[in-house]
A protein has these predicted regions:
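Conserved short alpha-helical segments that host acidic/polar catalytic motifs at enzyme active sites
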Residues: 1-158
Length: 158
């Protein structure tokens, strides 16, 4: 045990609703692009739902994503990283990115630069997040399974 040590884990099981079922499309996805700047912010994100305008966002922002990555989720960390490079704070960059989406989404994201902050978003209808609080940890899921068993207090947002 190390006093003050923290561990952040972000995982997600998702059947591909956009993109093929493949390891490169597995969540969480990271913010890396083919030609990322050396000082680009590193983020990861997991998505439940669909970013309906992901192809338009890729083109408009000229995202340079590796060819085998076809999931719509990849635009989340890539766009947040781009916004951070322009001087936005992490919460501002995340809000701006989510606001640009068409579709219904539930998102969890984290940044290497601010590991103490977990970013959560809901947009559209049909998605939800269950947030559970327990001693020294919190658990977030799109369904209550696992959350209610592991936490003393939980709430579902829709």
């Amino acid at each position: 045990s190390q006093p003050g040590a923290r561990v952040g884990v972000l995982g997600h099981t998702r059947w591909a609703s956009v993109g093929i079922i493949s390891e490169p499309n597995a969540h969480p996805v990271n913010s890396e692009e083919l030609e990322s700047a050396a000082d680009a912010a590193y983020l990861v994100a997991a998505l439940n739902g669909d970013v309906d305008n992901h192809a338009d966002l890729r083109a408009r922002h000229e995202l340079r994503l590796a060819q085998p990555i076809t999931t719509d989720a990849k635009v989340i960390p890539a766009l947040v990283s781009r916004s951070l490079a322009k001087g936005a704070t992490l919460p501002e960059a995340f809000r701006e990115t989510v606001a640009s989406f068409d579709g219904s989404v539930a998102i969890a994201a984290a940044s290497a630069e601010q590991p103490e902050m977990l970013l959560l978003a809901l947009k559209g209808s049909g998605q939800g997040l269950c947030v559970g609080l327990a001693d020294n940890r919190f658990i977030v899921a799109s369904e209550p399974y696992g959350v209610v068993e592991e936490t003393q207090h939980h709430s579902r947002t829709q």
